[in-house]
Regions:
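Membrane-interfacial segments at transmembrane helix termini in multi-pass membrane proteins
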Residues: 256-282
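Internal/C-terminal transmembrane anchor helices
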Residues: 274-305
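Membrane-interface helix/loop caps of multi-pass membrane proteins
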Residues: 1-265
Length: 306
């Protein structure tokens, strides 16, 4: 698990080890790393694939190509499930679960011409019209409702879920993003509210922390895994710890690394450790938070349920 988590290959490591995402008796501590693995593998491949897209002369051709690729990925997931294949293989596979990312590619290529014109103050009249904004906002609201509806439906083990519900959720998410970035969109302004922005800025840390904390807290209090049920109090405690640790990692790890890079952070940390005691405490807090992401993983595995 640790090797897969820190090399962004968790999905394939788990599959090679026979770990089942849907097994209720073996909740892996770093199970949530599978989606980050798919994402990072896409980031590695995208610089190679992007020039091929850019060879297409028109935006519509790029959008169509991305949509065809997304459809192929979804159909491949459906084929794996329909043939009686392993659900975890269908769910974890980068090839079978790339359709959400590819829909994002299509949306980016589709919006690029409009956003370029917006940047130079040359937005076309139709895009600024009240009708366009109302239509896009309605699509965004429909997307939000769709996501909530899909989340409330119990997952099955057929193609209705793999890829049906998953693909539908990705389409709904694309609709929300479209409404969120559309110039003058009311939904975009609503989604930019301070509490939602706070959550969005820390969403990476929230995702990283939530599952290991939940597994450990449930195991410590009930002796079972989260799939067997999470008591309300334990869930609330896991949420509180998740938000606190996400804020700490955002403030003392993510933001400095984005701003100064790894080497810059190391230099600043050494300088801060030589400074007065007040600054030293802040630096140590950052060091402790970073160490928790690495050294704490090994100790956490020992406490995880079998």
């Amino acid at each position: 698990q640790i090797v897969g988590a820190f090399t962004f290959s968790y999905n394939w490591v788990a599959l090679s080890g026979g770990d089942g995402y849907f097994a209720a008796t073996t909740p892996e501590l770093f199970r949530n790393m599978w989606s980050l693995a798919v994402e990072e593998q896409f980031y590695l491949l995208w610089p190679i694939v992007l020039p091929l897209f850019l060879m297409l002369p028109r935006s519509w051709a790029r959008v169509t190509t991305a949509l065809v690729a997304a459809t192929a990925s979804a159909m491949w997931m459906g084929a794996v499930v329909a043939s009686g294949g392993d659900l975890t293989r269908a769910y974890f596979g980068t090839d079978t679960h790339a359709f959400g990312l590819l829909l994002g590619v299509a949306l980016a290529f589709g919006m690029a011409p409009l956003l370029r014109r917006l940047a130079v103050g040359d937005l076309p009249a139709w895009a600024r019209s009240g009708g366009a904004r109302a239509t896009v906002s309605a699509l965004g609201v429909a997307g939000l409702i769709g996501i909530l509806a899909i989340a409330s439906i119990p997952a099955g083990d057929t193609t209705a879920t793999f890829p049906g519900a998953l693909l539908a959720a990705s389409v709904c998410a694309a609709m929300v993003i479209l409404a969120g970035v559309w110039p003058g969109s009311r939904l975009g302004r609503a989604l930019d509210a301070i509490p939602l922005r706070w959550l969005g800025d820390r969403s990476y840390g929230i995702y990283l922390w939530h599952w290991p904390l939940l597994v450990l807290l449930v195991a410590a209090t009930t002796g079972t895994g989260p799939e067997a049920g999470v008591p309300i109090g334990v869930g609330a405690l896991a949420l509180a710890f998740t938000l606190a640790l996400a804020e700490a990692s955002y403030r003392w790890v993510e933001t400095p690394v984005r701003r100064f890079g790894f080497r810059g952070c190391a230099r600043r940390l050494r300088a801060a450790l030589r400074a007065r005691a007040a600054r030293r405490a802040t630096a140590l807090a950052g060091l402790a938070t970073g160490a928790a992401l690495v050294a704490g993983a090994g100790a956490a595995v020992a406490a995880a349920p079998a």
